[in-house]
Design a protein with these regions (language model features):
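Conserved N-terminal catalytic/coupling substructures associated with nucleotide/phosphate chemistry
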Residues: 1-278, 282-292, 296-324
């Protein structure tokens, strides 16, 4: 009583809505039939599913059986996840044009108009390899050499780029009518997708808080086919690889309640740090390699940043490995 009522911000309102929003990918696409699914994409799905599950028998199953096993089709019809992952290009363009991915290339970061733009509306299992191929065409590499250590660091690490795109497609809000956009520059790449972070995730806790994917069925299928990590390890990989290469940390600071923006820099800020991580990892047993959290803390120390209370356990581990001295 007597308390002042304050207007609810857009961010708070969207957070409440997202907490209870239905799984778009699980919903039935009323216009879709099995004839609208791409046979080549289905073949890729079956191959990846059989490999991930270590069961070649899956290759002999009918398309209908595989789709049913993965819950991509039900008695009610074909799901939106099936359309996004497997739909024929012309059908995707007609029913869900927002599922397309736009790749724009600019030779300068100050440039407004793009030099080249390609739209990808193929089913995910066909599109993802084509998209990486086209990004890689303009890729380059740095050579790091010191003593016995000689290795090349690509401007854009394939695993990092694939994980970034997979995350955008898995977590985006398909009820918003805007495509996922990738802006590529000679030494920077920006991925923007519609919809804010999944409920409970913020820039500050992105590595530590488990989240429920916005498109749960889509994420489940990509997990079962070995495309994404269901436990959120995709973000871990993005940070792990980027920081290990001595580059600036992945930057999500441009994200808000309506879009997630990831900026990846190709520039190696600290070759010595990349060499240090490489040498440490080579000398550690396979089951004792540095974790993403240890590398994040080492990167903070390198940049003279304050460490948080949550970092204390990691600092102790690094001290036990004689990698730092406090």
């Amino acid at each position: 009583v007597g308390e002042e009522l304050k207007p609810m911000s857009d961010e708070v309102y969207l957070s409440i809505i997202q907490e209870n929003e239905p799984d778009f990918s699980q919903q039935i696409c009323r216009d879709a039939t099995l004839d609208e699914l791409d046979p080549d994409a289905l073949s890729v799905l079956k191959e990846k599913y059989a490999k991930k599950q270590n069961n070649p028998i899956f290759l002999t199953l009918s398309n209908r059986q595989i789709l049913s096993d993965l819950q991509l089709i039900t008695d009610e019809g074909v799901t939106n996840a099936a359309v996004i992952l497997l739909g024929k290009e012309d059908f995707i363009k007609r029913v869900y044009p927002q599922a397309s991915v736009m790749l724009e290339y600019r030779h300068s970061e100050s440039q407004i108009t793009f030099d080249n733009r390609i739209s990808y509306s193929q089913p995910f299992f066909i599109m993802i390899d084509r998209l990486w191929h086209d990004i890689d065409l303009r890729n380059g590499k740095f050579q790091i050499k010191e003593g016995p250590y000689i290795f090349d660091v690509p401007y854009f690490n394939e695993e990092v780029i694939r994980e970034s795109i997979n995350n955008a497609i898995t977590h985006r809000d398909y009820t918003r009518h805007s495509e996922t956009v990738i802006k590529q520059y000679p030494q920077k790449l920006i991925v923007t997708n519609a919809g804010g972070f999944p409920h409970g995730v913020t820039i500050d806790n992105i590595l530590t808080v488990p989240s429920t994917p916005r498109n749960r069925l889509l994420a489940d299928v990509l997990s079962k086919t070995g495309i994404v990590e269901r436990s959120g390890q995709g973000i871990d990989k993005i940070f792990y690889r980027t920081l290990s290469e001595g580059k600036e940390a992945p930057d999500y600071s441009g994200s808000d309640a309506f879009n997630v923006e990831l900026i990846l820099s190709a520039i190696i800020q600290d070759k010595a740090f990349a060499l240090f991580i490489e040498s440490v990892q080579q000398n550690l047993a396979e089951d004792n390699k540095l974790s993403v959290f240890e590398i994040v803390v080492l990167d903070k120390i390198r940049r003279n940043e304050k460490t948080t209370a949550l970092d204390k356990a990691v600092i102790k581990q690094l001290m036990d490995l004689s990698l730092i001295h406090v």
